[in-house]
A protein has these predicted regions:
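Sec-dependent signal peptide recognition
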Residues: 2-9
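Active-site neighborhood of glycoside hydrolase catalytic domains
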Residues: 494-505
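C-terminal motif of bacterial Sec signal peptides marking the signal peptidase cleavage site
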Residues: 14-15
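Aromatic-residue-lined binding/catalytic grooves and analogous aromatic/hydrophobic interfacial grooves
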Residues: 18-490, 504
């Protein structure tokens, strides 16, 4: 085992040559994504999208890494361990009565699940010129962080490029046909949040909404079986009776709490073209080239401030981001994006060699054959794909990578799409130093500093101790109490010394 560790370390260090790879590193496929898991991720460390690469209907599923349910006042803090209770649990454990100790801990020491990372919405692009596609290819070039879709339809060649720019904080989509007036498309937003509304203006399409003020993924039956109704005053009255028949509350259902969000989408014609914008969406026609600039913003204003009462105006922020990006043409936007991205990505070159036949295969076919056929170059590609995801998902000023990076389609995602800080968060950042991406750790270090603030309150109120403490899970609201109903996980503590481990591993 130690020999394997040495070999892995040698390979990682040998990869850091500082010379960029000669050939583009590309994941590619010969058909559109059939579901979210097959779509291609792009991101700029704050905004992200999953690109499906459709022909008749294209879809970009959108995320912004501050969009969460809840707010600071929704954080459950009513847990206090008395010295007598502490001594009793320790005594039971010393006596080997682990089940009794566990039951006591579940009843008195644990909080509840933290709040949830939320999807922003979807951008849909309808092709109004139907026809069978030929020569189809969609790809993600991780050498320059650009997703492309190319195909022919009715004898016309279409090319689509999408990227998420870190320097300009926008997502850019460029469409081109090789025939005059070849493009006829309609675009609109949707969102899983019932509060979201679409509005057209003279020059742009806007999506505005509010995330849920409270979400709970545990079922009513689980909560009641555990006797945890008192931990959920949003759902239960003082007598433990249900106030709602649902576990996701919006707006007036939760006293107006919840984070506001807004997206603004503007089309730009490098040459001629026609555009109609209404509340129903955007219609683009009579052109062979158009690009779109998409900005996204939320009312998040810090882990300790209410986004509904003390939040940033997402409309003003999204408009400001968009106006700055509009000062550049498409080629300049793309150049600024690729130069910024490659300043990080090109620090490492890692080449393993496979046959030309293997390299010519679509990536999904290569993965299918990998188990029984040596394909070293695919391993090198996946190594670089990991670095791509780090750069795309974690940049200074943003939030750390959560359990799904920055990409999530579900309002109640698996494990809350949170930060599991007893191991998974650390694992996300293990490659950062070894693969020469030190800057990408800044969001993690800032989260630790913020946890020390909420963690000092938990140390004082829960344990009657100085210093600070965090347990096994947190979110953008920097919860530091033990949460949920699983004591062997919930009580995984990250006090000051383990926080050094969290920082350095």
């Amino acid at each position: 085992m130690r020999t394997i560790s040495y070999l892995i370390s040698f390979l990682l260090l040998a990869a850091c040559t500082g010379t960029p790879s000669k050939a583009p590193l590309t994941l590619w496929y010969d058909k559109p994504a059939q579901n979210w898991d097959e779509a291609l991720p792009i991101g700029n460390g704050r905004a992200g999208a999953m690109v499906f690469g459709g022909v008749e209907k294209e879809q970009l599923q959108l995320n912004e890494n501050t969009l969460y349910s809840g707010e600071p006042s929704v954080v459950f803090k009513d847990v206090k361990i008395t010295p007598e209770m502490f001594d009793k649990v320790v005594g039971l454990m010393k006596a080997g009565k682990y089940k009794t100790a566990s039951d006591l801990v579940c009843k008195n020491w644990l909080g509840r699940l933290h709040q949830y990372y939320q999807p922003f919405g979807d951008l849909h692009i309808q092709n109004n010129k139907p026809g069978d596609a030929a020569g189809y290819k969609r790809a993600l070039n991780i050498s320059d962080a650009v997703a492309t879709t190319v195909y022919k339809q009715n004898g016309v060649k279409y090319e689509r490029e999408v990227f998420a720019s870190h320097p300009d904080n926008v997502i850019v989509m460029h469409l081109k046909s090789d025939t005059p007036n070849g493009i006829d498309i309609s675009l609109d937003f949707t969102s899983p949040h019932p509060t979201a509304q679409q509005k057209g203006t003279d020059d742009r399409l806007i999506l505005h909404g509010q995330a849920p003020g409270y979400v709970e993924r545990r079922t009513f039956e689980q909560i009641e079986q555990w006797g945890d109704q008192y931990k959920h005053p949003e759902l239960y009255d003082a007598n433990g009776k249900r106030k709602f028949d649902k576990r996701m509350l919006y707006g007036d259902e939760i006293g107006g709490k919840g984070m506001f969000f807004e997206a603004q989408l503007k089309p730009v014609f490098p040459k001629d073209g026609k555009c109609e914008i209404t509340d129903a969406g955007i219609h683009i026609y009579n052109t062979d080239e158009v690009y779109f600039i998409l900005s996204m913003a939320t009312s998040f204003n810090g882990f300790d401030k209410s986004p509904s009462r003390d939040g940033i105006d997402p409309s003003a922020k999204a408009a400001s981001i968009l106006e700055k990006a509009l000062s550049y043409d498409y080629q300049t936007l793309k150049q600024r994006h690729t130069e910024d991205y490659r300043s990080l990505f090109d620090r490492v070159d890692f080449e393993l060699f496979s046959s030309p036949e293997q390299k010519a295969m679509p990536t999904d076919k290569r993965l299918e054959q990998f188990a029984g056929n040596a394909d070293p170059d695919l391993a090198a590609l996946l190594f670089q794909f990991g670095r791509y995801l780090m750069i795309s998902g974690s940049r200074p000023g943003g939030q750390p990578l959560n359990l799904q990076g920055i990409w999530n389609k579900d309002t109640i995602p698996a494990w809350n799409c949170g930060y599991t800080i007893n191991i998974n968060t650390e694992m996300n950042y293990w490659p950062a130093e070894l693969t020469n991406l030190s800057e990408c750790q800044e969001p993690l270090f800032r989260m630790i500093r913020e946890l020390s603030v909420s963690g000092a309150e938990t140390a004082r109120n829960m344990y009657n101790r100085r210093g600070w403490v965090a347990h096994h899970n947190t979110s953008i609201w920097r919860e530091s109490l033990p949460n949920d109903n699983v004591p062997n996980a919930s009580l995984s503590q990250n006090t000051n010394n383990p926080a050094v481990y969290l920082s350095l591993n």
